């Protein structure tokens, strides 16, 4: 039986048990999950994924920690991702929102991309995909994944880009600005205010990062712009959220997102840079937030969950107009 026939057979067995794509078995009845109302609107499962006996697609995952590839169903993979991307004691609805995003991310990845690790559908390499920390899975993470089993975001019959970051600094941003995304800014991702939790670490809410001039010059070159010996550093063009699109080094425009990656994204925590100063050999940046600023803010999700919002409400804030569907 070829792949398409296997997929069709598995779906034929699984979907009737769920009702017409809409029966949320074991779901919280107080949550009004927004579902696609027709088969035509459901995203298709990636063709290269096999369907397991439990009706859940199976992944080949390359683990960079032990350099081995193993097969697991998507639900098990999602548990490890949720535990890697959020602390396992976070509010339940924030964990659920992260689970739905993690599931959407891996399905879109398997649909559109190929892992750089031969024989794998995806890896635990954060440069390629998502953080994966199975040792941090606890009862809360399992509950969040179980209660959102098979659920993913859907946009016009496809998987949307399920971007997320740690802390928006107060406002999210367009992918074209914060990520240099060339695919066009999706309708479901617009700059929007994001109320961040006061429990976020102080060095995430506001931070300072100091580099040598040589480090700045090398990062500029690695980002594609040679600037020579650094004399001046200024902020250039900005997006709606205030994030830098360019940084002017010796008057030359350098891509701010690329510069951040090259100089160290864990030190220059975002491109929401409020000031830059040159003092002797030191170049000091001050800014807010952590991460690229596109899509869901994890500390914003934390705050919404603390306020009593559901996972659905959290996702609809950060991805307005996007639906949630149950695929298995």
Regions found by a protein language model. Give the residues of each.
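Sec-dependent N-terminal signal peptides of Gram-positive bacterial secreted proteins and lipoproteins
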Residues: 2-26
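Post-signal peptide N-terminal segment of secreted/secretory-pathway proteins
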Residues: 24, 85-116
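N-terminal, intrinsically disordered, polar/charged segments of Gram-positive cell-envelope systems
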Residues: 26-62
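Extended substrate/cofactor- or partner-recognition/assembly subdomains adjacent to catalytic sites
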Residues: 104, 108-282
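Solvent-exposed, polar/charged alpha-helical surfaces in well-ordered, non-transmembrane soluble domains
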Residues: 76-80, 93, 97-100, 104, ...
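Soluble non-cytosolic domains of exported or imported proteins
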Residues: 68-72, 89-100, 210-211, 291-295, ...
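C-terminal soluble interaction/assembly domains
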Residues: 255-328
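Acidic/histidine-rich, surface-exposed loop or edge segments in extracytoplasmic proteins
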Residues: 60-61, 72-91, 124, 194-203
